[in-house]
C-alpha cells in the first residue's frame, strides 16, 4: 500500500533527537522511573518498562543510569514522584497538538505549556478537543531498500495491522500498542532493523505546512519540546521546506 513521503521527516526527526541527546536521557529516566512504579521493576513482565529500557539502549544511556531509575521507580531508591498529564491544543491554522508531560508540579507545567502555545500562535484546548484525531498504536519505520514483501509477510504474521510504503520507499508498520514488543521481536528475528520503533499517538490525517506557516509551526513545536516537563509531542502537522 503506497503513501506520501515520510522518510525525510523521519530522518529530520532522528537528527533532532541526536542533537538533544542529553534531554532525551532525562526524559527516558523519568519514563523508566514511572514505568517501574506503575508495573514493577521486572523488564520481562512490564512491557512499558521494556520499551523504555530499549529506548535507553538505543540512546546509548549508561546501564547504571537505567538501573538506578528502575530502583527509584520500584522503591529501591528515593526519588521524585512524577505525575503523568496530557494537554491538548491547536497550532498554526488549527493543527492538532498533543503534549504528554511528566511533572512533580502540575501548576507549573500547565502554565508553561499554555504560555508556549500562546506565545507562538497556538492555544490550549480542553480535554478531548483533539485527542480523538489520534490513534494509540505501535509504529515502526524501515529505510528505503528494505524488502517490502518479506517485511509485510513477517509483520502481518506477527500481528501488525498495516504496512505502507511511501514515495521514497520508506516502509511504515502499524500494530496494536499491546502487540508492540511481540511485533518488534518477530521483525528483529526475521532480520529487520527499524530506524524508529515507538508506541505513539498517530494522527488519522496529516496537514502539510510549508513556507512561513511551516516556520511558525516549527517554532511552536520547538518551544513545547524545550519545556523540561514535556515527554512527547504528537501533531498532525507535517513540516516541509
Swiss-Prot record:
**The name this protein goes by in its record:** Probable transcriptional regulatory protein mma_0544
Q: Which GO terms describe its molecular function?
A: DNA binding
Q: Which Pfam families match?
A: TACO1_YebC_N (PF20772), Transcrip_reg (PF01709)
Instruction: Please give the positions of the paired cysteines in each disulfide bond.
Output: none
Identify its protein family: Belongs to the TACO1 family.
Any one Gene Ontology BP term: regulation of DNA-templated transcription
Which compartment or compartments is the protein found in? Cytoplasm
Which SUPFAM superfamilies did the record assign?
Answer: YebC-like (SSF75625)
Q: Name one GO cellular component term.
A: cytosol
Q: Which UniProt keywords apply?
A: Cytoplasm, DNA-binding, Transcription, Transcription regulation
What Gene3D superfamilies does its record include? 1.10.10.200, 3.30.70.980
On whether Lyase is a keyword of this UniProt record, the answer is: no
UniProt cross-references to InterPro entries, sorted A to Z: Integrase-like_N, TACO1_YebC-like_2nd/3rd_dom, TACO1_YebC_N, Transcrip_reg_TACO1-like, Transcrip_reg_TACO1-like_dom3, YebC-like
- Chief site of localization: cytoplasm
Q: Does the keyword RNA-binding apply?
A: no
Amino acid at each position: 500500500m503506497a503513501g506520501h513521503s515520510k522518510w525525510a521527516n523521519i530522518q529530520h526527526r532522528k537528527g533532532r533527537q541526536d542533537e538533544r541527546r542529553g534531554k532525551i536521557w532525562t526524559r527516558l529516566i523519568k519514563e523508566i522511573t514511572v514505568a517501574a512504579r506503575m508495573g514493577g521493576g521486572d523488564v520481562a513482565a512490564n512491557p512499558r518498562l521494556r520499551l523504555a529500557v530499549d529506548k535507553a539502549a538505543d540512546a546509548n544511556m549508561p546501564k547504571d543510569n537505567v538501573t538506578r531509575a528502575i530502583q527509584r521507580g520500584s522503591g529501591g531508591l528515593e526519588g521524585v514522584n512524577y505525575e503523568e498529564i496530557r494537554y491538548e491544543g491547536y497550532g498554526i491554522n488549527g493543527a492538532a497538538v498533543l503534549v504528554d508531560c511528566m511533572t512533580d508540579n502540575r501548576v507549573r507545567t500547565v502554565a508553561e505549556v499554555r504560555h508556549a502555545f500562546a506565545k507562538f500562535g497556538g492555544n490550549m484546548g480542553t480535554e478531548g478537543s483533539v485527542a480523538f484525531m489520534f490513534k494509540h498504536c505501535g509504529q515502526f519505520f524501515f529505510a528505503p531498500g528494505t524488502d517490502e514483501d518479506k517485511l509485510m509477510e513477517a509483520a502481518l504474521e506477527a500481528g501488525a495491522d498495516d504496512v505502507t510504503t511511501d514515495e521514497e520507499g520508506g516502509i511504515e508498520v502499524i500494530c496494536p500498542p499491546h502487540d508492540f514488543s511481540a511485533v518488534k521481536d518477530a521483525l528483529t528475528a526475521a532480520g529487520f532493523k527499524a530506524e524508529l520503533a515507538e508506541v505513539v499517538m498517530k494522527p488519522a490525517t496529516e496537514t502539510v505546512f510549508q513556507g512561513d506557516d511551516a516556520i511558525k509551526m516549527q517554532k511552536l513545536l520547538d518551544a513545547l519540546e524545550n519545556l523540561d516537563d514535556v515527554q512527547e509531542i504528537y501533531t498532525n502537522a507535517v513540516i516541509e521546506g
